[in-house]
């Protein structure tokens, strides 16, 4: 098993973190339950002393036509998958043109934009070497019900790439900030929006040391420059406390915190 050092202050999308050892996994038999897969670190906040980090290597970066479905390796990124579906006139993953991440993380969090999400197109996934049908994965709003590493997945093939869906997803992205961030900080509560709640407690544009909630959209935690893990964690906890006190609603993080 190979090992490398990754500086997460450069590698992660929010540009917060420290140089850490990361195992590079190239075969199914190298996977263990202890591994915390980082992918492209787009939706992660990583503590400076976390252990057992790993990523899937080049053997998992592939897309293959299997006749009735398309098989995608766990390390293939969203852009690569989007381009394949568009080039082959396949519908269902148009939203990946506006999302970051690798296949494994996209399945694990049932990634999506509004009503467009992974589970609508997914057929099955290979988790820790075992193929599971979609129904067994417990996919829900930005979450799943399984433990383990997604090594590959299969998607149904329906012809007819939808340019209108891509256009709608591009429009949604216009409100996203340019500063380093990890996407939505919190999941939307049932029948409400995390951004509305955060704005309601005065956190839109609010700064705490070197982190803040974006002026463009309150549900985006941004790195103002040189921020550290504890600063981001403090702001997340502050937001949860304020929203709970004002609205009686427990906000749940969409960002995955590794510590």
From Swiss-Prot:
Gene3D superfamilies: 3.30.465.10, UDP-N-acetylenolpyruvoylglucosamine reductase, C-terminal domain (3.90.78.10). It catalyses: UDP-N-acetyl-alpha-D-muramate + NADP(+) = UDP-N-acetyl-3-O-(1-carboxyvinyl)-alpha-D-glucosamine + NADPH + H(+). One of its GO terms (molecular function) is flavin adenine dinucleotide binding. Keywords: Cell cycle, Cell division, Cell shape, Cell wall biogenesis/degradation, Cytoplasm, FAD, Flavoprotein, NADP, Oxidoreductase, Peptidoglycan synthesis. Its cofactor is FAD. GO terms for cellular component: cytosol. Its EC number is 1.3.1.98. Cell wall formation. HAMAP family: MurB. This is UDP-N-acetylenolpyruvoylglucosamine reductase. It comes from Helicobacter pylori (strain J99 / ATCC 700824).
